Amino acid sequence: MLIHPQFDPVALELGPLAIHWYGLTYLVAFGLFLWLASLRVQHSPFRETGWTRRDVEDLLFYGVLGVIIGGRLGYVLFYKPGYYAAHPLEVFEVWKGGMAFHGGLLGVIGAMALFARTRGRRWLEVTDLIAPCVPTGLASGRIGNFINGELWGRAADPSLPWAMVYPQSGSEIPRHPSPLYQFALEGLLLFVVLWLYARKPRATGQVSGAFLVGYGVLRFIAEYFREPDGFLGLLALGMSMGQWLCVPMVAAGVALWVWAGRRA
């Protein structure tokens, strides 16, 4: 059995400026996106349609806005609507934490639609470009969660070699290190599968559909090891909010994949 190291959340202090590990994981995520998306635009079908490195940089700008705005609004609406209805100004206090992946996904989808419209490109062409690059950012974020000692898992069998006690949880119960599970599933595994899948010619929209299905299924599985949010607990059918949000995500992914294949 292991004990969470309780890392200092501040990686570096430069005078009055404190640089947090979680912020650095975002920088790593953005850097990986630039690198991987730049590789993708060098190959078919994006090379033939005139994609450039500058397009990728602009795409990142749109994506960052989508992640921040969508992630925050998703947390507010999906997880704590009552609280923020009573404290509306706190919606803007992003530095206090509170982001939701599913909201961030919707924000990015909207941002990609706006980018596609301003550049005269097909929306699904844009989402197909970025889909295989996203899991590395998710992996980076989960490392940030682990360093911060947050989003710990449900109680685990003490005999499990990697069961971990989180002192910050207020108990000595051994738990699953769920951020590391999500790092492996939604990050590394999903990246490898999508990157290999996208290397072959696919109908426009199928890579995006594969991402929705892949993430939804893997997140659904990971949620069984993650402690539900204390203010929500488990919902209908013993499922967490994260799992319920994955259900329409997987359904949309399957529908998109089938529709794109028939339309090709």
UniProtKB/Swiss-Prot annotation:
Keywords: Cell inner membrane, Cell membrane, Membrane, Transferase, Transmembrane, Transmembrane helix. A 1,2-diacyl-sn-glycero-3-phospho-(1'-sn-glycerol) binds at residue 142. It is an enzyme of class 2 (transferase). Pfam families: LGT. Its EC number is 2.5.1.145. Catalyzes the transfer of the diacylglyceryl group from phosphatidylglycerol to the sulfhydryl group of the N-terminal cysteine of a prolipoprotein, the first step in the formation of mature lipoproteins. Belongs to the Lgt family. This is Phosphatidylglycerol--prolipoprotein diacylglyceryl transferase. The gene is lgt.
